[in-house]
């Protein structure tokens, strides 16, 4: 509360800041013979936004929300002129010059339909936008699918990277409010496609008003209600049980222009994959074999099972999602207000290993995520050229994962029932309860051929939950002083983070105490929080500890294990000078980062409290607030009306991924104990990550309806996190902490060079085309903070060698083409028919051919090299590359008008040719089809000899054909998604 009150106080004291939701109109009004018309009025139709021209006929209209408008210029004695289809983009200037014709009759008017701008003369960096029309026509109906088409953007294993960056170096906003997942990277919200006015990608080089993003910003801007009521109802259905119902409505309500979109989606399989059906029939008689089960793979247990897998229908992967996106704009002349509200609630079932879980799908995990965002912005014009603005936003994200059989628990005691055989029997069935070895000991799996298949009723998940809150406050001013747009602002953000996990082993121990200990009278007693025996057991078996919760799942706000509350405060000043032949955008930004982590008072002697399973808190203090100064400079040179050059230099800074340094005191005790390998340790007093970037580019409109953009860039990022030892820690330090305990430290870097090419056309003979190509060379020491775990382990207390190599998440070559073909309104039966084709290609990502032994792995897992400590590179790191990937998406739609109502029928196909794209490979073989285990005698000979054809048959079907061992180890797949067909209809009014 103390921090919150400080933020609110600052909010009312300071008058600086800006949110990225609007652009501006700028131009001149002159007569047809070129004479400047002073005092002409320029109005954005349907709004109170407008300006009068100065003595040179020039005007500027600030703070125009992104979208499409009609703009009218009027002057006494001249025909009023209206230009429609005027597109305003966030943070860019829309040039609009009017030439008015003299009029002998009062009230004469001229209407002009504006054309799509192909060159942004005011942009001093690379900005790629997708407007509402392009979003609606696209063959991929997802924000991610549209981002994947943009130059500089790479999506590898579900994570988005911009210009060779790590995923955590990309920021995301929605209607100017931050929606970045600062804990685990990525974005928390994807807006409803029909609610979007535009999506924009800024690949670095932005002005001083943008922070917290070293490599790029992805902006989603919601639509504003129009001057008339209108709406749309849309329904689609498709493969894998997919349904989608979306409705939008917007228009005026008195002084309010509102817009709302509601979307409800359902799918039976939210993660479709290339699975292959199989039956285990070792004797080849055409009948599925009855296979004897063995206790832990050794002793017959008297049970038999049939292994028959249907790869076309995977159980327990249902997902349901409900979204609401709303905006409301109120215009009171010099004062206007915009409100944004977002709700995004999802529930989904998980089944990452459908073959191993085929007999126990009822007990697989289910998860729930609830997200709300509220934002408000107040703008006040002191005069047409002086704008004050203030904004407030808050976002809350809660997540919970639980047992699918029992459902969401109301508390600790409910979760204990998951590990109680009587509760399993009464909730599932008697047979499932009877499978348990004791009332508190879960059953062993069916082992056939050394492959474990879970028995019905076995527990599969613990109880986990986390909660994150983001609070943002900003205020600002914009002053248009002639050709100078001067902006200054203050931006404050605070985050609150809590996480909790109750493991199945802890559940088992508490249930054991209830069943066998005189010190625990009942489940009520166990869940009371006051039973010391239970509290001690939880402390022993929940070694990871909690942040912001106690071990019983109650919120906890005190001490070192309370919630983490990192924050940032930023101040900037920026001057954008726009004259006819040059644009100069220069500014400086100062960021202060408070990580809310700790620092050790004596790094050579960590305060490890061995006896109390924690730390000596007096040996730690709050980390210092870090300050970063970031100058920015961008220039644009419109050499001709068709050619613009731009240059950019800038420094950028951000906090590290916050999930990495945070650890409970109990987990710190575990790491310093040194008995266990802990690949995800903690960090202390970490510094910001900083980037320096240079960019030069040219935009050239080589035809009246076509333009290209070529941009070259280079950047260097320092201070990225990596695993390291505290080399100053001695073997005989006073508290006895392990000298080879790992830590997250600043010390990594990335160097990226590349260029981007884009082609964009207006509609030419029904066809509109967009194409992009990116070449990049991204190198560094590590691709992620844990990449050097093997090196660190093998080099013990000496620093591992620093070798620069290609980063595994990058594509050296990446391209995309979108072709949108539409028949016009006067082409008979074909009127309203349209097609959209997307083609995406990339050259794969780097990997390293490696060898090594099996390590501590079960026979059914093979010898995958998941643990970096057991990998032995057979070539320079990152020397090999996965195969090229190709994706084709196609959409066809037909629109007709029935009595003023628009009806559209549509169908679209993702991965049109059902291409089995290889997105990852086995490190040992370098391909996605054979892991080299069965073919390598030194790895598998003894196992195969002891278990025969059944083992081989299972290994080939479970692992090689269906990648269960790879999913188990890496949590991802070797192949991209299969073909998905969707179709539906929409009605617009």
Regions inferred by a protein language model and the residue ranges of each:
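Periplasmic N-terminal accessory/gating domains of Gram-negative outer-membrane beta-barrel systems
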Residues: 79, 84-95, 108-207, 217, ...
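Periplasm-facing N-terminal accessory domains of Gram-negative outer-membrane beta-barrel systems
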Residues: 18-109, 113
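Signature of Gram-negative outer-membrane beta-barrel scaffolds
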Residues: 311, 315, 460, 487-642, ...
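C-terminal beta-signal and adjacent terminal beta-strands/loops
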Residues: 273, 826-868, 883-887, 895-989
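Gram-negative outer-membrane beta-barrel transporters
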Residues: 712-716, 721-847
């Amino acid at each position: 509360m103390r921090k919150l009150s400080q933020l609110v106080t600052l909010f009312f004291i300071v008058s600086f800041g800006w949110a990225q939701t609007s652009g501006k109109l700028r131009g001149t009004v002159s007569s047809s013979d070129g004479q400047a018309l002073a005092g002409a009025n320029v109005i954005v139709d349907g709004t109170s936004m407008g300006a009068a021209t100065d003595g040179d006929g020039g005007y500027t209209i600030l703070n125009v929300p992104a979208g499409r408008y009609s703009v009218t210029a009027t002057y006494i004695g001249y025909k009023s002129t209206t230009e429609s289809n005027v597109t305003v983009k966030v943070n860019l200037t829309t040039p609009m010059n009017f030439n008015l014709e003299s009029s002998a009759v009062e009230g004469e008017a001229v209407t002009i339909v504006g054309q799509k701008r192909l060159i942004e003369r005011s942009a001093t960096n690379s900005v790629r936008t997708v407007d509402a029309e392009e979003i609606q026509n696209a063959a991929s109906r997802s924000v991610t699918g549209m981002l994947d088409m943009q130059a500089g953007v790479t999506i590898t294993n579900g994570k988005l990277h911009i210009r060779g960056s790590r995923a955590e170096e990309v920021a995301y906003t929605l209607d100017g409010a931050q929606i970045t997942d600062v804990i685990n990277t990525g974005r928390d919200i994807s807006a409803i496609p029909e609610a979007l006015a535009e999506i924009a990608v800024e690949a670095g080089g932005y002005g001083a008003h943008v922070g917290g993003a070293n490599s790029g910003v992805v902006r989603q801007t919601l639509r504003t209600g129009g001057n008339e009521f209108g709406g749309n109802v849309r329904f689609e259905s498709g493969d894998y049980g997919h349904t989608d119902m979306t409705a939008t409505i917007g228009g005026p309500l008195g002084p309010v222009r509102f817009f709302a979109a509601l979307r409800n989606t359902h799918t039976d399989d939210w993660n479709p994959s290339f699975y292959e059906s199989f039956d285990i029939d070792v004797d080849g008689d055409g009948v599925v074999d009855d296979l004897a089960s063995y206790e832990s793979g050794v002793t017959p247990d008297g049970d038999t099972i049939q292994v028959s897998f249907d790869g076309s229908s995977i159980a327990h992967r249902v997902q349901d999602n409900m979204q609401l996106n709303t905006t409301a704009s109120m215009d009171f002349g010099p004062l206007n207000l915009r409100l944004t509200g977002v709700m995004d609630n999802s529930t989904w079932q998980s089944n990452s290993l459908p073959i191993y879980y085929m007999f126990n799908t009822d007990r697989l995990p289910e998860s729930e995520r609830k997200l709300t965002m509220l934002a408000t912005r107040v703008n006040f014009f002191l005069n047409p050229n002086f704008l004050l603005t203030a904004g407030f936003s808050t976002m809350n994200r809660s997540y919970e994962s639980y047992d699918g059989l029992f459902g969401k628990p109301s508390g600790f005691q409910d979760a204990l029932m998951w590990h109680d055989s009587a509760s399993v029997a009464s909730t599932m069935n008697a047979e499932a309860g009877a499978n348990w070895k004791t009332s508190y000991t879960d059953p062993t799996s069916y082992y056939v051929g050394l492959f474990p298949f879970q028995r019905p009723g076995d527990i599969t998940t613990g109880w986990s939950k986390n909660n994150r809150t983001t609070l943002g406050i900003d205020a600002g001013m914009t002053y248009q002083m002639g050709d100078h747009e001067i902006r200054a602002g203050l931006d404050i953000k605070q985050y609150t983070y809590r996480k909790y996990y109750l493991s199945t082993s802890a559940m088992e121990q508490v249930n054991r105490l209830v069943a066998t200990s005189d010190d625990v009278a009942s489940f009520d007693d166990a869940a009371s929080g006051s039973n010391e025996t239970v509290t001690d057991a939880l402390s022993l078996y929940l070694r990871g500890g909690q942040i912001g919760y106690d071990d019983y799942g109650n919120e906890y706000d005190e001490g070192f294990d309370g919630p983490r509350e990192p924050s940032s405060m930023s101040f900037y000043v920026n001057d954008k000078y726009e004259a006819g032949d040059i644009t100069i955008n220069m500014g400086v930004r100062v960021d202060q980062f408070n990580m809310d982590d700790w620092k050790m008072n004596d790094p050579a002697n960590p305060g490890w409290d061995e006896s109390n399973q924690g730390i000596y808190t007096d040996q730690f203090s709050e980390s210092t607030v870090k300050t970063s100064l970031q100058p920015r400079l961008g220039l644009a040179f419109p050499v001709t009306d068709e050619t613009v050059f731009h240059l950019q230099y800038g420094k950028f800074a951000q906090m590290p991924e916050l999930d990495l340094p945070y650890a409970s005191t109990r987990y710190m005790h575990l790491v310093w104990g040194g008995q266990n390998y802990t690949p995800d340790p903690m960090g202390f007093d970490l510094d910001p990550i900083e980037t320096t970037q240079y960019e030069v580019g040219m935009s050239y409109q080589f035809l009246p309806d076509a333009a290209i953009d070529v941009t070259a860039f280079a950047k260097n990022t320092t201070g990225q996190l990596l695993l390291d030892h505290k080399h100053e820690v001695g073997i005989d330090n006073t508290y006895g902490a392990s000298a080879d305990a790992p830590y997250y430290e600043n010390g990594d870097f990335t160097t990226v060079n590349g260029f981007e090419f884009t082609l964009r056309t207006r509609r030419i003979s029904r066809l509109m085309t967009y194409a992009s190509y990116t070449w990049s060379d991204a190198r560094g020491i590590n691709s992620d903070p844990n990449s050097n775990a093997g090196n660190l382990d093998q080099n013990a207390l000496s620093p591992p060698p620093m070798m620069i190599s290609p980063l595994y998440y990058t594509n050296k070559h990446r391209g995309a083409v979108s072709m949108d073909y539409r028949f016009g309104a006067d082409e008979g039966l074909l009127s309203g028919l349209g097609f959209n084709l997307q083609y995406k290609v990339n050259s794969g990502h780097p990997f390293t051919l490696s060898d090594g032994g099996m390590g501590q792995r079960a026979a059914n897992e093979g010898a995958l090299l998941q643990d970096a400590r057991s990998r032995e590179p057979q070539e320079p790191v990152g020397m090999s590359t996965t195969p090229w990937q190709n994706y084709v998406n196609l959409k066809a739609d037909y629109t007709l008008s029935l009595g003023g109502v628009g009806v559209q029928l549509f169908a679209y196909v993702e991965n049109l040719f059902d291409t089995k794209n290889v997105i990852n490979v086995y490190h040992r073989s370098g391909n996605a089809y054979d892991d080299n285990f069965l073919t390598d005698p030194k790895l598998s000979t003894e196992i195969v000899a002891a278990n025969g054809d059944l083992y081989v048959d299972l290994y080939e079907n479970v692992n090689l054909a269906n990648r269960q061992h790879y999913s188990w180890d890496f949590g991802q797949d070797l192949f991209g998604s299969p073909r998905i067909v969707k179709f539906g209809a929409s009605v617009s009014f």
